[in-house]
From Swiss-Prot:
Subcellular location(s) per record: Cytoplasm, Cell cortex; Cytoplasm
GO cellular component terms given for this protein: cell cortex
Region (Disordered): 1-38
Domain Protein kinase intervals: 46-316
Lineage: Eukaryota, Metazoa, Chordata, Craniata, Vertebrata
Binding locations of ATP: I52, G53, C54, G55, N56, F57, G58, E59, L60, K75
Reaction catalyzed: L-seryl-[protein] + ATP = O-phospho-L-seryl-[protein] + ADP + H(+); L-threonyl-[protein] + ATP = O-phospho-L-threonyl-[protein] + ADP + H(+)
Protein name: Casein kinase I isoform gamma-2
Cysteine pairs bridged by disulfides in the record: none
Enzyme class: transferase
GO biological process terms held by the UniProt record: Wnt signaling pathway
InterPro entries: Casein_kinase-1_gamma_C, CK1_Ser-Thr_kinase, Kinase-like_dom_sf, Prot_kinase_dom, Protein_kinase_ATP_BS, Ser/Thr_kinase_AS
Known EC number: 2.7.11.1
Gene that specifies this protein: Csnk1g2
């Protein structure tokens, strides 16, 4: 299966963060520590540590900013990659990362035979948290996630980008213990694409017979049909993910086929054959209303994000919930690249009017604090950087997590 690789804070606070972390692309090359330990560095400040994730792009390493003592994530891609995407992804992050819910990007440059992008280190993904909660989320948790992610996707779309990679692994909470810990972040823009032509300023044309881009479990029906993706497809994929969280699984999971192509065909056929009413049965009508709306959108049409958000905020209020960031995983020990964290119960968000409550999150920062003597970035730089397997990306095999997923007892349920 071919995959198309084409691609809250004010200015003062943002400036402080930039000056503190030394962000922006640098012309500095890679330098070693100059010691016998052979410490691998990215740029002048970032020490490369242990492997914490992998994907078709290459791999992800834990890193440390030696100037600020903050942990970071370092994404590595072979310079001679057959489908290089990291520099384009860096450019997209630069377009997006001045807002809440998108990780800060600190640096892009060479690292030996690799390109390296240094990012803010975040917490567990929604898929990891889903596992932690026995693979079902309550309605309250799903609505708090949905309200935030509609806002995230709207922001991405306002920057002339479509995301095209909706899956729980690509939405992460902030670092446990930080002010960002309750905010849902969107990561991995390796499959993102400009839907507004930067030259003509016009919407990209409608096309058919496109190769599949994304994760088959969540992608829109039109994507299965080979149609060019636009804003509507991101929102439909989100709707499928919301139902996955509520139901625990989707009707098109676990399908068997002799080839990947046949399997994707079966997944698409089952999606089309599953009425929205059946998919959303026993759940609030708003879930079905959401999916009906996004599936009826025209290719060129701008979605009414306020309408979709209001669907869920009204349901949230009628259900008597409080937007207190008390997710289903609150109080559970959370895995991180630097050890398990036992988070405190989240405090009440600052008082604000009702309209703000459901469209903005708490003010965030990314300070990680001083490192202890058991620094997980120390002593790992000499570990070889594994080249990505020479295979095409396929369905759930695409992975770009901000820390290594734990192995599961059974892979069947994830098909």
């Amino acid at each position: 299966m071919d995959f198309d690789k084409k691609g809250g804070k004010g200015e003062l606070e943002e400036g402080r963060r930039m000056s503190k972390t030394g962000t922006s692309r640098s012309n500095h090359g890679v330098r070693s520590s100059g010691t016998s330990s052979g410490v691998l560095m990215v740029g002048p400040n970032f020490r490369v540590g242990k492997k914490i994730g992998c994907g078709n792009f290459g791999e992800l390493r834990l890193g440390k900013n030696l100037y600020t003592n903050e942990y970071v994530a370092i994404k590595l891609e072979p310079i001679k990659s057959r489908a290089p995407q990291l520099h384009l992804e860096y450019r997209f992050y630069k377009q997006l990362s001045t807002t809440e819910g998108v990780p800060q990007v600190y640096y892009f440059g060479p690292c030996g035979k690799y390109n390296a992008m240094v990012l803010e280190l975040l917490g567990p993904s929604l898929e990891d948290l889903f596992d932690l909660c026995d693979r079902t989320f309550t309605l309250k948790t799903v609505l708090m996630i949905a309200i935030q992610l509609i806002t995230r996707m709207e922001y991405v779309h306002t920057k002339s980008l479509i995301y095209r990679d909706v899956k729980p692994e690509n939405f992460l909470v902030g670092r446990p213990g930080s002010k960002r810990q309750h905010s849902i972040h969107i990561i991995d823009f390796g499959l993102a694409k400009e839907y507004i032509d930067p030259e003509t300023k016009k919407h990209i044309p409608y096309r058919e017979h496109k190769s599949l881009t994304g994760t088959a479990r969540y992608m829109s029906i039109n994507t299965h049909l080979g149609k060019e993706q636009s804003r509507r497809d991101d929102l439909e994929a989100l709707g499928h993910m919301f139902m996955y969280f509520l139901r625990g699984s989707l009707p098109w999971q676990g399908l068997k086929a002799d080839t990947l192509k046949e399997r994707y065909q079966k997944i698409g056929d089952t999606k089309r054959a599953t009425p929205i009413e059946v998919l959303c049965e026993s759940f609030p009508e708003e879930m079905a209303t959401y999916l009906r709306y996004v599936r009826r959108l025209d290719f060129f049409e701008k979605p009414d994000y306020d309408y979709l958000r209001k669907l869920f905020t009204d349901l949230f209020d009628r259900s008597g919930y409080v937007f207190d960031y008390e997710y289903d995983w609150a109080g559970k020990p959370l895995p991180t690249p630097i050890g398990t964290v036992h988070p405190d119960v989240p405090s009440q968000p600052p008082h604000r009017d009702k309209a703000q409550l459901h469209t903005k999150n708490q003010a965030l920062n990314s300070t990680n604090g001083e490192l202890n003597t058991d620094d997980p970035t120390a002593g790992h730089s000499n570990a070889p950087i594994a080249a990505p397997a020479e295979v095409e990306v396929a369905d759930e095999t695409k992975c770009c997590c901000f820390f290594k997923r734990r192995k599961r007892k059974s892979l069947q349920r994830h098909k």
